[in-house]
Amino acid sequence: MRLLPLASVTLLSVLCAQAFAAKLEDTAPYPKAEDGFTRQVIHLPKQQHEDRYKVEILAGKTLTVDCNLQRLGGKLLEKNLEGWGYPYYRLDQVSGPISTRMACPDGKTREDFVPVTGDGFVLRYNSKLPIVIYAPKDVEVRYRLWSAADKTENARQE
């Protein structure tokens, strides 16, 4: 029974150490978010062969939509942390939504995540640095990981 408290303390120490190591300020002095913006951070786990992975940034808003395909517009711009050379990203403006114009006979609507589409939303995978994104306060940032298959195919000359 004496091992249980020791195990709990050890587990708590490990979790606290991981949480502390994941703090953005421990990596570099990234600027605070400006008024009207939030600073959102993604810490990626280490992968073997990180060159085979990509990170897709899904910035967007939850909106009321119908049967049509909805999209927002914007560009995710890469900036450089002066003196450090580390990248961070900024989504300055979000336009839209734009929508297809199909008739929706049932007239039903639902709440759904509508992503921003545009340039700069697919990033290189690098677990050594956090992905830091500055986005307008009303924009939610999600992400998806993409990985390449081990097998490659040859192109044919024609």
From Swiss-Prot:
What the protein does comes down to:
General inhibitor of family S1 serine proteases.
Secretion signal, residue range per the UniProt entry: 1-21
Q: What is this protein called?
A: Ecotin
Q: Which family does it belong to?
A: Belongs to the protease inhibitor I11 (ecotin) family.
Per UniProt, subcellular location reads as: Periplasm
Transmembrane stretches, start-end: none
| Entry GO terms, CC | periplasmic space
SS bond partners? C67-C104
Marked site (Reactive bond) residue numbers:
R101, M102
The record's note on quaternary structure and interaction partners says: Homodimer.
Primary location class = periplasm
What GO MF terms are annotated? Answer: serine-type endopeptidase inhibitor activity
Sorted alphabetically, the keyword list is:
Disulfide bond, Periplasm, Protease inhibitor, Serine protease inhibitor, Signal
